[in-house]
Amino acid sequence: MIPVYEPSLDGNERKYLNDCIDSGWVSSRGKYIDRFETEFAEFLKVKHATTVSNGTVALHLAMSALGITQGDEVIVPTFTYVASVNTIVQCGALPVFAEIEGESLQVSVEDVKRKINKKTKAVMAVHIYGQACDIQSLRDLCDEHGLYLIEDCAEAIGTAVNGKKVGTFGDVSTFSFFGNKTITSGEGGMVVSNSDIIIDKCLRLKNQGVVAGKRYWHDLVAYNYRMTNLCAAIGVAQLERVDKIIKAKRDIAEIYRSELAGLPMQVHKESNGTFHSYWLTSIILDQEFEVHRDGLMTFLENNDIESRPFFYPAHTLPMYEHLAEKTAFPLSNSYSHRGINLPSWPGLCDDQVKEICNCIKNYFNCI
C-alpha cells in the first residue's frame, strides 16, 4: 500500500533521541525544547515561539491567552479541520462560519467582513492544505475593526506570502507537528507571537499557571500543555531539513500536475504571490464528475493506493449543524465533495507518483 503520508526520519532524529535518553532529560525540560523554540522562531523570523503538546492545544492556548471566552464570537472558515472550531467552543466562545473563495479553498475575506459584529473578538485564518489564505487582507481587516487575528498554520509550515512566512501576520499563530505534518515531532505543536504579553500568558497557562520564581505558587486555573524534550529532539532534527522536505513535496505536486493534465480535475493551484508548501497534494474533480469522487478513491484503494477525502465543512457536523443551514455555504459544500488528497510524503519516488497518476487515468478510461 502506498500511504497518504509517511514521515521522513532519516536525519538526526535517532541521534538526538538517544542524547535525550542518555542525559535523562526525557520530560518537559531540556536543551532540545530550548533549541526547538529558538530555531523555530528564527526560521519564521518571529520574536517568540513556545512548544506545546499538540496542535489542538496550541489553538486553545492561543485563544485562552487572548482572553477569548463566553459571549465572544470568533469567525472561522467552515472548510477546515474540526479542531479549529472545537477549540473556539472549548474557550466558551461561539464559532461564526465563513465561506471559502472557491478553488483556492481559502476563506473569503468578503464573507469574513460580512460576519463581523459587536460580539466578534477574533478572526481565525486557516491556511488549508499548505496554501496561504489572503492573510494580508485579513490582517488589514482585523486592524480596521480592532480584532485579534489568529493564524492556524497546522498545515502550512514554510508557506509564504510575498516572501513572508505565514505565522508572522497574526497576533498569535499556531503550528502542528503530528506524524502526518510536513515536519513532525511525533505529537507536538508551537505557539508563536511577536507580543511579549501574549507569549508570557501562554507560558504561564501551559505550565499550570505557576508564578516565575516562586515554586508551587499558582495564580491561574491553567493547563499542562508542555512538550517533552523527546518530542522536541525529533522536532529539531526535522527543522534542520524542512526546506529539503518542502522542496520534495513541491516537486511531487508538480509531477501530479503534469501527469494529470487533461483529466477532468485540477491539482490545487498556487495563488499569485504565494509559496505553497503542499502539505498534501490535493485534486479537485470538475463539478460534473463529483459523483465519481468516492468511486475513484475506492479504485485507488483496490490498487493499494491510499487517499483521503477533503474535510467535511464544520457546519455540516452534528454538533455544529444548528449554527447554519447545511446549504448555507455552497462553495465549501461543493469543494468538500469533489476533493481528494493524494500520497504526498517527501520520500515518494517519481515512479510511485506516476503509478498513482496512471491508476487515476485508468479509472477515468473505464467510466
Swiss-Prot record:
Residues where N6-(pyridoxal phosphate)lysine occurs?
K181
What this protein needs as a cofactor is:
pyridoxal 5'-phosphate
Write down the top EC class of this protein. Answer: transferase
What this chain does, per the entry, is described as: Catalyzes the synthesis of GDP-perosamine from GDP-4-keto-6-deoxy-D-mannose and L-glutamate. Also shows weak activity with L-glutamine.
Q: How does activity depend on pH?
A: Optimum pH is 8.0.
Q: Which GO terms describe its biological process?
A: O antigen biosynthetic process
- Catalyzed reaction equations: GDP-alpha-D-perosamine + 2-oxoglutarate = GDP-4-dehydro-alpha-D-rhamnose + L-glutamate
Against Pfam families, the record matches this protein to:
DegT_DnrJ_EryC1
The protein's UniProt keywords, in alphabetical order, are: Aminotransferase, Lipopolysaccharide biosynthesis, Pyridoxal phosphate, Transferase
The EC number of this protein is: 2.6.1.102
Give the quaternary structure: Homotetramer.
InterPro entries linked to this entry: DegT/StrS_aminotransferase, PyrdxlP-dep_Trfase, PyrdxlP-dep_Trfase_major, PyrdxlP-dep_Trfase_small
Protein name per the record: GDP-perosamine synthase
The entry assigns this protein to a family as follows: Belongs to the DegT/DnrJ/EryC1 family.
- Gene3D superfamilies, per database record: Aspartate Aminotransferase, domain 1, Type I PLP-dependent aspartate aminotransferase-like (Major domain)
Its gene is rfbE
Q: Which GO terms describe its molecular function?
A: GDP-4-dehydro-6-deoxy-D-mannose-4-aminotransferase activity; pyridoxal phosphate binding
Q: In which pathway does it act?
A: Bacterial outer membrane biogenesis; LPS O-antigen biosynthesis
